[in-house]
């Protein structure tokens, strides 16, 4: 439901000025913001003034088909878009990477060679993969807080919120087949929204380019511009004969969407209007200076160092074996992605002086808040952050070290399943684990990262178990020799013979003991304290958020991203990352050929692409480059405010047609989860014409093109 921005909940609390209610006269930056689609009518005037030709109802409607009905949450952390009347779905290569890997083997290396289903029968099912369409979203604050009064405690408030949320979810999911719902807190609990989804779980792999296209540039180019990565994969949604969600079955038929995106062949020019429609994961736009300082000065540097150790170990062994490269390709990409992002985030925060800027803002807020209920918020937050820091540090080290030891995590999970009599579940875990496990990588990472834990984490946070093991073996290296040498979980055949009756032996195994002892330490010595302090901080942020809205009543506050559907709009724009340097907003095939190097894995393109380039056989996908010669567009950048989760999001032009799919941000702008800078923040998108060129000229899969609708 749409509201006008001023609400009073039933408790008679202070009036809260909500983000969408007042068009900003003091909005921080023109293209900053991740806006709720159901309230987009509050922004549509600004969007139209910048060139958008459609209405708010075209973007989001519950009464008629709208663009929202062509956008999906892909899996649990990406976005995808429907591009045909037969359920064809486009997302990023890195979003579908796990599925491509699962179908790959040395004999059928779809990661290396790509995969294209030339018929419906060849499309590959993906157990566990689902896509979710948003049916509707609405403000349910009054429903969720019904029964709460100011004299109740926070624990009682939590109970009321939980009970009311569960009841509401139960009611709305009974409305039809395949429905699931969530109730999400916005503005730190000042507002609650219901999100109702229809989830389809028969999603089949249709096509993916080879990694030399879909992952071109690898980790070297990740987060960077200019970019030349063909980061896309294609799936198809299937439904039962009535178009309802259904488990995989050969009897299922392609899903018929309410709406799908038409594809623009008109290309992009500097200044063109763009908007990204997707599911951004997490932002922290409103945290105070002390929270930012911890991120940039302590957390990011520590995590970068720990992941460097793991990446170096993986790289060493992956370069020596094709089998190991396949096994660890997805894991390596996962570790490297955040590793590089944190580096850019840290640099951006420091370059912008975000900590100092927030401190100055806090001084002005404190002066305004004198004599009000908000006067003590900032000192209390500052004190809580100081108390929280060592626990957060210990938790982050645990996550990046002990919790990342593959063998121990696996052993602990299998032992738990077997002890509970779940032999089938244990067998499934084992099959997936051993397929993609290489002991030397795991052991090498253990030695490096656990050594860092012992050195960097204050001794008061060292588990007693760890102290005993180091005293016993004398060094982390010797400890690793014993653990990996003695654990039966390094042997798949031995694990396959385990039964529930072997519980004592399993729990005495060094790998299981490692996992369990660290979990117990974290559960008793870290988590309870961190949870309590974070809870106190969140409660204060609820008041601080409300105070900021009263302090700046003309500013448009958008809710932090939380993996719910958002609209971010901006324009095609280059940028200057350094003095004397300007990056144009479009990259082309010429850049791919400049980077092409058969001696470097990440830059070794398919021979077929070299042949097409030599013959200039570009077909209808050709454009005239800056040098006046024919080329093919590859990627572009724009000023849309995006985050993790926006991977695979449709990038849409002024007429609502698809011009690309979002897949990254520029490295200099990765601090946009905390502070958006219009000079540096750019989202990187794959030009839809390069997708079509790849399907047509490299894959020769023109049957897919025939499903699509093109506009100029």
Residue ranges of each PLM-predicted region?
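Bacterial N-terminal signal peptides
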Residues: 12-22
